Amino acid sequence: MEMASAFTLNVRLDNIAIITIDVPDEKMNTLKAEFASQVRAIIKQLRENKELRGVVFISAKPDNFIAGADINMIGNCKTAQEAEALARQGQQLMAEIHALPIPVIAAIHGACLGGGLELALACHGRVCTDDPKTVLGLPEVQLGLLPGSGGTQRLPRLIGVSTALEMILTGKQLRAKQALKLGLVDDVVPHSILLEAAVELAKKDRPSSRPLPVRERILAGPLGRALLFKMVGKKTEHKTQGNYPATERILEVVETGLAQGTSSGYDAEARAFGELAMTPQSQALRSIFFASTDVKKDPGSDAPPAPLNSVGILGGGLMGGGIAYVTACKAGLPVRIKDINPQGINHALKYSWDQLEGKVRRRHLKASERDKQLALISGTTDYRGFAHRDLIIEAVFENLELKQQMVAEVEQNCAAHTIFASNTSSLPIGDIAAHAARPEQVIGLHFFSPVEKMPLVEIIPHAGTSAQTIATTVKLAKKQGKTPIVVRDKAGFYVNRILAPYINEAIRMLTEGERVEHIDAALVKFGFPVGPIQLLDEVGIDTGTKIIPVLEAAYGERFSAPANVVSSILNDDRKGRKNGRGFYLYGQKGRKSKKQVDPAIYPLIGAQGQGRLSAPQVAERCVMLMLNEAVRCVDEQVIRSVRDGDIGAVFGIGFPPFLGGPFRYIDSLGAGEVVAIMQRLATQYGSRFTPCERLVEMGARGESFWKTTATDLQ
């Protein structure tokens, strides 16, 4: 049976050809290798029709132009040569579109990313809608790749090399107004007139490329170029710590094209694409992409979710304010905040105002849209307006009796169907539900701070939580823009449980004499966004260490923190950045102030600050304990799969994405090698490094957690 075409051609009476992109049976348009023959057949028809005045590419999908190339194509390549051939095929197709003798215009609405933007760049002009869904970018670097269908060559020539490098090196996505300002698109119009605006542009001569700003012209010259690439190279190396080979290759390929011409540039692009596709970093990053896509499709349980029309929040603090923001402004649901103190309500409302006003200032949002979203949030000091809320999120202090009281009050003041979701980070959900009249409607919903930035939530059913409660809570988390993983109701859940030994070990090394900045730098070099000591300061030392006694009581000595160190720090009124002093000292500008290590920290904890360990030795000690605990979590079914474990670690604590998560990292080293390292560390530093039974068994059998492909579990 012949495959339905993703590209269809219709010629209007005014002799403008409309090519409609609509990949059959898919929500998103993605480019596949087999579409090349369809596009070539259309190009042949266009060339044969001498009456044509212009061509418009437009999508039939409601909210995307082309979201990128189908990543499975890369996974199917077995060698760098095969991946290189894939890139050359894409380059050739784009060249054929660009070589058409009549104006070719891309009419863009929704996501125009990766190969989609490369197709738009191959057109002679671009018009996009002013809709918030419309974004343009080249995110390939986030998969350990570079744009392989001409993007590294066309974009710098269109918008200037420094602006193009920023887009390609970061995967940054532009909104319509930004794209227009930079010259990436020629016009921005309402969605209702997109096609007509593109047709009008197609009837004119090919749009002439607008002159680049003087700065960009200087940077494109030999002297400016040398300086630019040196500066950007240094900045990129500092940011990536050499862990992401794609960034280095992007710089090399863009510079080749500018210095030696487009022919050499395209050649370098295809070659680099092929080589990068085979790197372990790209394979790991693609595995994270597939796993997160998979998690987002997972309903959490087999039961259908209940309707979600409105949400209540108990507590207007930092977490409550953040949860209110994502519920109203991302999920679009009415939110009612209850706080015993009117100040708490004001704080929560101001939090959302600040977030939205920032978007208005950056021109990402209209003032009218800001007001519309803010109108979804209201507050009260009692339970007025809570009677018909479908789900209540509790974000009060970490106190069991208080949370049990909240359950009782919600059951008394809300509807019989109302779900109670606790944002606890350490208390067992079963204990919170112990006196509930409807325990099947009690669940944990653990957000991470700052709520609006952290993509992960843990959803924690206790033994009596119903399947529908799980499904409804998962549905809410997805509407809030979060990636949810369902975890078992055991102390620390998953993320905090694997994080605690990692932080404990960092503190232990401090007491042994390692310096704060050396420990943090070692873990940043390993690939974490910040080091463990800085992380503790950012979270708040009081908040971050509260869970350690809970974990020690549940799991024993391996979770014990170095004696008296935490209490010494807290007794000295050191809470971290929030009060200006922790392991680091902070200036007066709050979150934006620069930090420096406080030398007084060493005598306070009885340490010398004269360490002897190398950076890899420091990282090894912290990371091995995290890996061991992650394997225990699989063994005890705290997480449902290693997929969830990898996603939880990468999205919840910033485990290096280029390693693919704890389980993929164990596979890359080999379970046997991890066991050998841990046994050596156990001999040197104590029994907390003893590898767990599951890891030892897997090492002995030569087993791995994942199959060899990026998408399949063992």
From Swiss-Prot:
EC number: 4.2.1.17, 5.1.2.3, 1.1.1.35
Pfam families, alphabetized: 3HCDH, 3HCDH_N, ECH_1
Chain intervals for the UniProt region annotation (Enoyl-CoA hydratase): 1-190
GO cellular component terms attached to this protein's record: cytoplasm
Catalytic activity: a (3S)-3-hydroxyacyl-CoA = a (2E)-enoyl-CoA + H2O; a 4-saturated-(3S)-3-hydroxyacyl-CoA = a (3E)-enoyl-CoA + H2O; a (3S)-3-hydroxyacyl-CoA + NAD(+) = a 3-oxoacyl-CoA + NADH + H(+); (3S)-3-hydroxybutanoyl-CoA = (3R)-3-hydroxybutanoyl-CoA
GO molecular function per UniProt: 3-hydroxybutyryl-CoA epimerase activity; enoyl-CoA hydratase activity; long-chain-3-hydroxyacyl-CoA dehydrogenase activity; NAD+ binding
Residues at the site labelled Important for catalytic activity: 118, 140
GO biological process, one term: fatty acid beta-oxidation
Alphabetical UniProt keywords: Cytoplasm, Fatty acid metabolism, Isomerase, Lipid degradation, Lipid metabolism, Lyase, Multifunctional enzyme, NAD, Oxidoreductase
Keyword Lipid metabolism: yes
InterPro entries per UniProt: 3-OHacyl-CoA_DH_CS, 3-OHacyl-CoA_DH_NAD-bd, 3HC_DH_C, 6-PGluconate_DH-like_C_sf, ClpP/crotonase-like_dom_sf, Enoyl-CoA_hydra/iso, FA_oxidation_alpha_subunit, FadJ
Region (3-hydroxyacyl-CoA dehydrogenase) residue spans: 306-714
Places the protein is found: Cytoplasm
Functional pathway: Lipid metabolism; fatty acid beta-oxidation
Stated role: Catalyzes the formation of a hydroxyacyl-CoA by addition of water on enoyl-CoA. Also exhibits 3-hydroxyacyl-CoA epimerase and 3-hydroxyacyl-CoA dehydrogenase activities.
UniProt record similarity statement: In the N-terminal section; belongs to the enoyl-CoA hydratase/isomerase family.
Subunit-structure text: Heterotetramer of two alpha chains (FadJ) and two beta chains (FadI).
Protein name: Fatty acid oxidation complex subunit alpha
Lineage, top ranks: Bacteria, Pseudomonadati, Pseudomonadota, Gammaproteobacteria, Enterobacterales
